[in-house]
Each structure stands twice: as C-alpha cells, then as structure tokens.
C-alpha cells in the first residue's frame, strides 16, 4: 500500500497595508482593554509604543471594524506589537500587546 503524503497546515500570513506614523496621533482617546494585559505588558509600555511607534499597519479583515497594528519600542527598547480597534473614528481600543512575533517582524522587514 503506497504511503499518503502528509498535509502540512500553513499558518495564515498577515495581510496589511502601511499607514503614516502620525495616524495614531489623530485619536482623541486611547483605551486599553483587559485582554491587552494577557502577555504582561504594562499600561505605561503600551502608551509608550503608541507614542513612539516605528511602523503602523491597517490589518485586512472581513469584519467592519478597522484593526490597526502598531509596532514600536517599550520603555526598555524592546520591540512590541500592539493591536487596536478604531471606535467611532475618535478613539482607539487596544486589545492586544506583546513582544513582537517572527511573523510580524517579517511583515515589518517586507519579507512576507
């Protein structure tokens, strides 16, 4: 009996388009949801990333909400990824913050 080929599941790649760094500054408020603290990133570091972002991307998705990926250094200089939802074109709700992953780093370097 011939052996069947193993199917390898590919992880989905992030699809995004770059945004100007001044994009985050247009929000009147930045709120942080409790899920953003899941990976141990502090409130101060989340605000530091938003204020000193090096790259900002709008993530492509099927939902109606605008999801924004913000990449920048924390207070110690480590790169973090922060994801926020735009709410009513006025505020940004941060829902995710963690040390930058390899897949996101590839996106930044343009190798995706």
Regions found by a protein language model. Name each.
Residues 1-112:
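Ribonuclease/tRNase effector modules and their secretory precursors
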């Amino acid at each position: 009996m011939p052996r069947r080929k193993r199917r390898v599941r590919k992880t989905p790649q992030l699809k995004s388009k770059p945004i100007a760094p001044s994009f985050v500054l247009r929000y009147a408020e930045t709120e942080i949801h409790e899920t953003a603290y899941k990976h141990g990133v502090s409130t101060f570091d989340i605000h530091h990333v938003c204020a000193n972002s090096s790259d900002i991307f709008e993530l492509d998705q099927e939902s109606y909400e605008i999801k924004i990926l913000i990449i920048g250094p924390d207070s110690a200089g480590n790169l973090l990824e922060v994801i926020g939802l735009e709410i009513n074109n006025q505020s940004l709700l941060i829902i995710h913050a963690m040390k930058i992953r390899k897949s996101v780093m590839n996106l930044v370097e343009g190798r995706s």
